[in-house]
């Protein structure tokens, strides 16, 4: 049998190859724009980096999210937005992020066009909540997300259109809403025959 750490290294390579050739849903021009970073650790058991937003903030307080935020005029691109905001929120050194590319843009309930970027970071990358908006940073094993063990499915009614949104529970954290939907879209870019 192939060692587990070798399997994960092969998976990271497959993810990199697939993302670089992936043509996702582009940003919506007429909406305000934001970007988030889906950072995957380059380790024997890859993990995704999340933030828990502080209850002190009005928008998304107490919610789990990927690091990221709104596009600003000084940003060179949405990729730059994702990297800038991630560094501001988590202290993550943007120079150590190997961006593979974007996946499908999603539209939030506030009508913001959010583009996620997948990037590989060193397994021992330093994280600390740099912003008052962030209560803590934590990691979730990619293997947990690939198993798709949903805590529940939420029924959402948006202007008469009904759709279901997944929610995941990892330890005491609930991953739901736009962040959970982004995890589901990430599945589209991952190797379909990889078993964890």
What does each model-found stretch correspond to?
Residues 56, 70-171, 175:
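Unchanged
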Residues 10-28:
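Entry/capping segment at the start of metal-dependent catalytic domains
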Residues 26-66:
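N-terminal strand-loop-strand
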Residues 186-192:
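Conserved small/polar residues in nucleotide/adenosyl-binding loops
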Residues 1-10:
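Short, Lys/Arg-enriched N-terminal segments with co-localized hydrophobic residues
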């Amino acid at each position: 049998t192939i060692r587990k750490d070798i399997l994960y290294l092969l998976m990271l390579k497959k993810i990199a190859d697939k993302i670089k050739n992936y043509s996702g849903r582009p940003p919506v021009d007429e909406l305000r724009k934001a970007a988030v970073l889906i950072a995957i650790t380059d380790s024997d058991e890859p993990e995704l980096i999340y933030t828990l937003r502080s209850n002190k903030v009005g928008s998304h307080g107490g919610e789990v999210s990927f690091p990221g935020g709104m596009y600003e005029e000084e940003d060179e691109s949405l990729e730059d937005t994702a990297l800038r905001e991630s560094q501001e929120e988590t202290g993550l050194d943007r120079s150590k992020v190997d961006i593979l590319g974007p996946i499908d843009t999603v539209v939030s309930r506030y009508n913001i066009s959010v583009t996620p970027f997948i990037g590989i970071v060193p397994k021992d990358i330093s994280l600390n909540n740099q912003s008052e908006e962030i209560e803590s940073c934590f990691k979730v094993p990619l293997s947990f997300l690939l198993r798709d063990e949903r805590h529940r499915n939420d029924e959402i009614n948006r202007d008469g259109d009904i759709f279901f949104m997944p929610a995941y529970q990892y330890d005491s954290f609930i991953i739901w809403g736009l962040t959970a939907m982004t995890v589901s879209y990430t599945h589209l870019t991952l190797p379909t025959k990889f078993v964890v």
